[in-house]
Curated annotation (Swiss-Prot):
The lineage of its organism: Bacteria, Pseudomonadati, Pseudomonadota, Gammaproteobacteria, Enterobacterales. One of its GO terms (biological process) is queuosine biosynthetic process. InterPro entries: QueA (IPR003699), QueA_dom1 (IPR042118), QueA_dom2 (IPR042119), QueA_sf (IPR036100). HAMAP family: QueA. This is S-adenosylmethionine:tRNA ribosyltransferase-isomerase. Its main location: cytoplasm. Keywords: Cytoplasm, Queuosine biosynthesis, S-adenosyl-L-methionine, Transferase.
Amino acid sequence: MRVTDFSFELPESLIAHYPMPERSSCRLLSLDGPTGALTHGTFTDLLDKLNPGDLLVFNNTRVIPARLFGRKASGGKIEVLVERMLDDKRILAHIRASKAPKPGAELLLGDDESINATMTARHGALFEVEFNDQRSVLDILNSIGHMPLPPYIDRPDEDADRELYQTVYSEKPGAVAAPTAGLHFDEPLLEKLRAKGVEMAFVTLHVGAGTFQPVRVDTIEDHIMHSEYAEVPQDVVDAVLAAKARGNRVIAVGTTSVRSLESAAQAAKNDLIEPLFDDTQIFIYPGFQYKVVDALVTNFHLPESTLIMLVSAFAGYQHTMNAYKAAVEEKYRFFSYGDAMFITYNPQAINERVGE
């Protein structure tokens, strides 16, 4: 399968740079997996699409202000993007500099260069950085960090992004990108879903900066997926098994929830799904056998990204590309701050041959 099979024309004007004034007021394109039929509506239509007893699975990760600016003590500006927090004093990060710092290099971070840190080791493309400060890593990031808006949102981060680029139910700090499908849920909508009898469960997947890395190979099968930490606790496993047992659907909110659930299913030894507390490198593309997820709420993804491949594996390649073509024609807003899709599973997707 070729990466170019997942390309589509997207006018620059359709990339959303700010979210809708009201979270749940975005548009919703519904794709019926088995037939490919499309329905245009509003995000709150989700209320009518879910049944009492259906299980919504959210990702409760919280985005950290992961972008830091500063310089090497020896001179030369640097930009640091935290990939993950290792402990209270250390981070693993991408560093942009005219010349990469060497182990032992002293870094002065923050717009006022008030934070002192040391680059202690290099692991491939990533740098280990230790803060020489009394405060915890999270406190330091909250005080000097910038929200790591995706590269295609072409503007500096603003104070408002600290909440806008965060789901209302976010709880566990550690992501450098928001699980964006969740951005459309506000408290009134969550309340109405609960009142209808829709069940809710929360996994945690700390989205890494790798989510924005382009696929740099021609053939999909050659792509090495980045690694992210995921937690699927026992209560989520119980909720999934209970929903399946009573004939209800498991609906993943976002591709990160999909990857968490399907990773836990892949690692399970005895049951359909078992608890998972581990890094995952799961790469879902056409031909993948889904085991857990029956429906998906997701945003519109970048051409040739691993995420449009995941959706194609779920709804079917042809149905997915047709939906994206319609979305462009109907001027839906794309990417992190854009509109959403509701997609039901297409069991025939696994048999589809792509690019032949």
